[in-house]
From Swiss-Prot:
GO biological process, one term: symbiont-mediated suppression of host cytoplasmic pattern recognition receptor signaling pathway via inhibition of MAVS activity
Biased composition (Polar residues): 1-28
Assigned GO CC terms: host cell cytosol; host cell mitochondrial inner membrane; host cell nucleus; membrane
Protein name: Protein PB1-F2
Main localization, broad class: host cell
Underlying gene: PB1
Species in which this protein is naturally found: Influenza A virus (strain A/Chicken/Hong Kong/YU562/2001 H5N1 genotype B)
InterPro entries associated with the record: Flu_proapoptotic_PB1-F2
Length: 90
């Protein structure tokens, strides 16, 4: 990939403005996102219930030890299906 060429990923994260609602502080920019900063971003914009679910998801994702892309995809899909079933039951 050529240097300076934005991918959809970098466009959606590096240039995302985070507005702190009601605090009067200036907006922050995610210049070099990593797992922790992305998690922080999601926690700021989510409801308390959604926030708890996202924390659980991120802790599980970050706890994986050297996952291959295939095993990660399988694990995430299983969690997503289970999560959706629970949402419909509740």
């Amino acid at each position: 990939m050529e240097q300076g060429q934005d991918t959809p990923w970098t466009q959606s994260t590096e240039h995302t403005n985070i507005q702190k609602r009601g605090s009067g502080q200036q907006t922050q920019r995610l210049e070099h996102p990593n797992s922790t900063r992305l998690m922080d971003h999601y926690l700021r914009i989510m409801s308390p219930v959604g926030m708890h679910k996202q924390i659980v998801y991120w802790k599980q994702w970050l706890s994986l030890k050297n996952p291959t892309q295939g095993s990660l995809k399988t694990r995430v899909l299983k969690r997503w299906k289970l999560f959706n079933k629970q949402e419909w039951i509740n």
